[in-house]
Amino acid sequence: RKGAPVQQTVQESAKGRSKDRKNNKERTDDRKMREAAEEFLLTKLGISSAWMARQSGMLIRFGEWLYLAPEEMISMEGLKVLRPGLCLLADRKNRFEPAHALALSLDREDTDRVRELTKEEAERYLHGESIPCLEERGWTLLTYEGYSLGFGKASGGQMKNHYPKGLRKSR
């Protein structure tokens, strides 16, 4: 700038470079997070590549949640947005957990990790109880009569319940 002290111009320039470095780091972190999320969807949840291919959009982070937002979405800057798209995953303590909304968006054919529940098992699941299982460890889409109910996590012969507490039926 004309007439500005050299010292001030150098400091502003350094601030600009550090801001650029910070933005580059955030972009790199976002890219790594997106790659890790896609890996989780494909390997840990067994989501089919066909389902992934049908989903057009961009992964965005909104708090601790990862959403699939439409490609043509406008900027949310200055807006109060409740949910910017389909909620896919929560990023908790350096691990991902699938969102209930993701489970409801899936059909049986969309994942290879699916279990059809009996009426009694479905009732127990909707009440928030664990279900005995023979499945290997990991996340499983639980369905009843072909409809997705939510996710469970198999561990130690039990299907741990991950049905949202606010939706659980009381006895």
Where are these regions (language model features)?
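Polybasic, low-complexity RNA-engagement segments
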Residues: 1-171
